[in-house]
Regions:
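Flavin (FAD/FMN)-binding glycine-rich loop and adjacent Rossmann-like elements that form
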Residues: 1-10, 14-26, 30-169
Length: 169
């Protein structure tokens, strides 16, 4: 970002043509993390006022090969699709080491395919490239650990496979 006083005069972009300075008349910061605003010198508030803590990042993944009948039976038996009872049992045995107490999954259109939105990565700063890289590494490990627990303990996931993992937090 290049400024002329308090006005953004150019955005510096990098693409296949290299670095380019693009003149601006008006700028809408649609980065999602206030990148342009922060680089232009605007005051940016990040995280909670009292400690700066931000919402945990998550690394979603898709699994297929889920036995939906077995999964549905377990949900009806426990009257919960969050598997709280199972998570508490696994936490008591020391197998569930994650900092959250629920399992979140969403049925997708393909039979036996679910999106898992359960990972929670605390202390990831979405505005810092290094923090995002470390968070991505932690997230991939967490996906592997969570999926192994799912296959061992969650009804319907015994023969499931990881179909895809999100490319970004």
């Amino acid at each position: 970002v290049e400024c002329d006083g308090k006005r953004i005069s150019h955005l510096i972009l990098h693409n296949k043509s290299g670095l380019q300075a693009v003149p601006t008349r008006a700028v809408v910061d649609a980065t999602g993390d206030a990148d342009v605003a922060a680089r232009s010198g605007c005051e940016v508030v990040k995280g909670r006022p009292e400690d700066g803590l931000m919402t945990p990042a998550t690394l979603m993944f898709h699994v297929d090969g889920v036995d939906q009948d077995a999964l549905r039976d377990e949900i009806y038996r426990t009257e919960s699709n969050r598997f709280r009872e199972l998570v508490q049992k696994l936490r008591a045995t020391g197998e569930w080491t994650f900092p959250y107490d629920i399992f979140i999954s969403v049925q997708l259109t393909e039979k036996g395919t679910l999106m898992i939105n359960t990972t929670r990565l605390v202390d990831v700063d979405g505005t810092d490239g290094w923090s995002l890289s470390l968070g991505m590494m932690r997230g991939r490990r967490e996906v592997e650990e969570l999926f192994a627990l799912m296959q061992r303990h969650f009804p319907g996931f015994e023969k499931a496979r990881i179909k895809r993992v999100a490319p970004m937090l």
